[in-house]
C-alpha cells in the first residue's frame, strides 16, 4: 500500500455522493422514566449538543487523552463497559435513539465513568461539520444495521463515501474497528476498507476480537444459534 492524500477515495467512489449518507434509521421506541430522568439530570454533565462548527474535543472532555468515536451504541451497555476497561481513553458516543441515550447516561452515572460524552444526532453531520481533521485516535462501529434485503444494501452505512468522510478525522496510526454478525456485510466491509490505499488491515482478513470489546447479549445468543461474528480492524497509514 502507498501513502495517499487525506481525501483519497477509491476509484469507484460515486461523484457528488454526499448528503444521501445517513447513519441511522428512525424507529419507534419507548422511553422509560429512568431513561428520561437520566437525560434530564445528566445531559449537562455528559451530553454534547450538536454544533455546525469544529469542536475542541480536549476542551469538551477536559483532558488530552486519546479520543475514540463510537457510531451507534444501541442501549449503551457495551459502550459503558469499554469505557470502564479503557479509563485512559475518551469516548464520544453518538446515537439518535432516545432510550439508548438515556440508558447510556444512566450507566455512566452508575459506573462513575468520566471518560464518555454522548451526542444525540446524525453521526454523518457530526463527522462532516464538528470533528476536526486528525482529532481521532480510533473509530468504533459495532453491529450497524445490515439491511438484509439486497434492494436495501444501498442503505448500509459502511460504504466508500462514508469511509472517505471518516478517514481525514483519524490521526495517522489511528484505527477503524468494525464488527458485524452478518457474513455478507462483513465481506462488503472488508472490500470497502481494503479499497483505500491509506488503510492497512491489521490481520490477513478478519481480526480476532480485541480484548476491549465485550460480547453483547445479542451476540452471545447468536453464537449459541451458530451465527458468526466478524471483527475488522484497519489502521490509517497515511
Swiss-Prot record:
It comes from the Bacteria. Its EC number is 2.1.1.33. Pfam families: Methyltransf_4 (PF02390). Pathway: tRNA modification; N(7)-methylguanine-tRNA biosynthesis. Substrate binds at residues 149, 181, 216-219. GO terms for cellular component: tRNA methyltransferase complex. The keyword S-adenosyl-L-methionine applies. SUPFAM superfamilies: S-adenosyl-L-methionine-dependent methyltransferases (SSF53335). The active site is at 145. S-adenosyl-L-methionine binds at residues 70, 95, 122, 145. It is an enzyme of class 2 (transferase). Signal peptide: none annotated. It catalyses: guanosine(46) in tRNA + S-adenosyl-L-methionine = N(7)-methylguanosine(46) in tRNA + S-adenosyl-L-homocysteine. InterPro entries: SAM-dependent_MTases_sf, tRNA_(Gua-N-7)_MeTrfase_Trmb, tRNA_methyltr_TrmB_bact. The keyword Iron-sulfur does not apply. GO terms for molecular function: tRNA (guanine(46)-N7)-methyltransferase activity. Coiled coil: none annotated. PROSITE patterns: SAM_MT_TRMB. Keywords: Methyltransferase, S-adenosyl-L-methionine, Transferase, tRNA processing. Catalyzes the formation of N(7)-methylguanine at position 46 (m7G46) in tRNA. Belongs to the class I-like SAM-binding methyltransferase superfamily. TrmB family. PANTHER family: 3-DEOXY-D-MANNO-OCTULOSONIC-ACID TRANSFERASE/TRNA GUANINE-N 7 - -METHYLTRANSFERASE, PENTACOTRIPEPTIDE-REPEAT REGION OF PRORP DOMAIN-CONTAINING PROTEIN. HAMAP family: tRNA_methyltr_TrmB (MF_01057). This is tRNA (guanine-N(7)-)-methyltransferase. It comes from Neisseria gonorrhoeae (strain ATCC 700825 / FA 1090).
